[in-house]
UniProtKB/Swiss-Prot annotation:
Keywords: Acyltransferase, Amino-acid biosynthesis, Arginine biosynthesis, Autocatalytic cleavage, Mitochondrion, Multifunctional enzyme, Transferase
Organism: Paracoccidioides lutzii (strain ATCC MYA-826 / Pb01) (Paracoccidioides brasiliensis)
Family that this chain belongs to: Belongs to the ArgJ family.
Protein name, UniProt field: Arginine biosynthesis bifunctional protein ArgJ, mitochondrial
GO MF term list: glutamate N-acetyltransferase activity; L-glutamate N-acetyltransferase activity
InterPro entries for this protein: Arg_biosynth_ArgJ, ArgJ-like_dom_sf, ArgJ_beta_C
Protein role: Catalyzes two activities which are involved in the cyclic version of arginine biosynthesis: the synthesis of acetylglutamate from glutamate and acetyl-CoA, and of ornithine by transacetylation between acetylornithine and glutamate.
Additional observations: This protein may be expected to contain an N-terminal transit peptide but none has been predicted.
Keyword presence, Acyltransferase: yes
HAMAP family on file: ArgJ (MF_01106)
The protein's enzyme class: transferase
Site (Involved in the stabilization of negative charge on the oxyanion by the formation of the oxyanion hole): T162, G163
GO cellular component terms given for this protein: mitochondrial matrix
Annotated localization: Mitochondrion matrix
Length: 473
């Protein structure tokens, strides 16, 4: 007898029941957005978006196999913005990365009007023709905005692309889609969600967040921040690790915006890893149009700077964690926290090494409390100070999400009697925290706390191999 499946819609996307291990992946062909049940909770049903910003998505057919689904997104501001961005360190920087850098440099981070993004083709390693394609995308948006790129400062729109490397864009189709997207620009939640959906590739759900907050100088004044990201594979920091667009209506000068973003990225997008690969296209951009009014943040010494830094960093961390939760084939969201290190740099290096380890990631997928693999990763971490890792001081434990007592695996270099049944129960949960205590945090013998490093990562499953083996086919 056939069982009847119930289909429903979350925020305009089809959702359906699936097996625990199965996930809907677009691979290299965009298709209807089937959101796995376990991911539906991450898709917002509403939002509060920054004043003066508009969003939209449109269909261009960047991939010939995509005959109807949106693959071009626009984020525009009604008034010029301050803007800053952090880019990939990959030597093969994609054309949109190079063009966006040029736009920001020519305009000194001021008078930026928006961002245009396409999915389905990375426009990376495409030579001079690829650069011209990226420039034409920026110019087309400027034309639609009524701000021609013929000004002495050049174009005012940033460009991002994601997808397969080494192929030219179907630029005519994209240039035809940009005016369509522009005509659909809106401040509604649906418009923002459509834009977030348009930039997805192997993502199983659109990653969109929005928040309201206040600042010390105007405690009764409401400000807003919104952001979207895409990314599920080729994720490892060196920044930025993916595509991210953040917008706020707080008035912030270009001089203050760049350090705000750099600090936030270093503690969010640069603290995640899915597979250890750094893309050619990684970009995270922050736009601030000041539409909400109030006192302008001009320097790090401005009254609202510290509070804005806290808001932005927390928001960026939430966005970055969504990327990990949608890691290709992932079944686990893992936090690794390294405590009592002589320096934060060493703590982060160790956390990063654990997060990248294929042996750690596969053990977690197999629900195997194989702490020896964690110790191995700690021990071969490169670039840390002599004496940071002392086996006789090192402790490792699993911290359950239910708040129960930590499961101690290693204490001061001594292996513990591990209750394997409890370990298996802990590893059944989607979320897990690994705590590494280096026991070397005392400074000057005064018992002061040492430095901490944190990373978020996911496991490796059979599906990760399937997705990436089939990516171009």
């Amino acid at each position: 007898m056939k069982t009847q499946q119930s289909f429903h819609v979350v925020a305009g996307f089809v959702c359906f029941p699936m097996s625990k291990t199965s996930q809907s992946r677009c691979y290299s062909t965009l298709r209807d957005f089937l959101i796995p049940p376990s991911k539906q909770k991450f898709v917002p049903s509403s939002g509060t978006y920054p004043k003066g910003f508009l969003a939209a998505g449109a269909h261009a057919g960047v991939k010939e196999s995509n005959t109807q689904f949106r693959d071009v997104a626009l984020i525009c501001s009604k008034t010029p913005c301050s803007a800053a961005a952090v880019f990939t360190t990959n030597k093969f920087q994609a054309a949109p990365v190079q063009v966006s850098k040029q736009v920001l440099e020519a305009r000194e981070g001021a008078d930026i009007t928006g961002v245009v993004i396409n999915s389905g083709c990375a426009n990376a390693v495409t030579g001079k023709g690829g650069l011209e394609d990226a420039k034409s995308m920026s110019a087309k948006v400027d034309e639609c905005n009524g701000t021609p790129s013929t000004s002495s400062k050049g174009p005012s729109t940033l460009v991002m692309s994601t997808g397969v490397i080494g192929r030219r864009l179907p630029i005519k189709r994209i240039l035809n889609a940009i005016p369509v997207a522009h005509s659909n620009l809106s401040s509604t939640h649906k418009a923002w969600l459509n834009a977030a959906r348009s930039i997805c590739t192997t993502d199983t759900f659109p990653k969109l967040l929005s928040r309201t907050f206040t600042l010390p100088s105007s405690p009764n004044h409401t400000y807003r921040i919104a952001g979207m990201t895409k990314g599920a594979g080729m994720i490892h920091p060196n920044m930025a690790t993916l595509l991210g667009i953040l917008c706020t209506d707080v008035p912030i000068s270009p001089a203050a915006l760049k350090p705000l973003l750099s600090h936030a990225v270093s503690r969010s997008f640069n603290c995640i890893s899915i597979d250890g690969d750094t893309s050619t296209n990684d970009t995270v951009a922050l736009l601030a149009n000041g539409a909400a009014g109030g006192q302008t943040i001009t320097t790090p010494s401005s009254p609202n700077y510290a509070a804005m830094q806290t808001v932005l960093t927390s928001f960026a961390q939430s966005l970055a964690q969504l990327v990990v939760r949608d890691g290709e084939g992932a079944t686990k969201f893992v936090t690794v926290r390294v405590l009592n290190s002589p320096s934060q740099a060493d703590a982060r290096a160790i956390a990063s090494t654990i997060a990248r380890s294929p042996l750690v990631k596969t053990a977690l997928y197999g629900r195997d409390a194989n702490w020896g693999r964690i110790l191995c990763a700690i021990g071969y971490t490169q670039g840390i100070q002599v004496g940071t890792v002392v086996p006789e001081r090192t402790s490792v434990s699993f911290k359950p999400v239910d708040g129960s007592e930590e499961l101690k695996l290693l204490v001061n270099g001594e292996p513990q009697m591990v209750n394997e049944e409890r370990a298996a129960r802990i590893l059944q949960d989607e979320d897990l925290e690994i705590v590494v205590d280096l026991g070397g945090g005392e400074k000057g013998g005064e018992g002061m706390a040492g430095e901490e490093g944190i990373y978020w990562f996911c496991d490796f499953s059979h599906e990760y191999v399937t997705i990436n083996a089939d990516y171009r086919t």
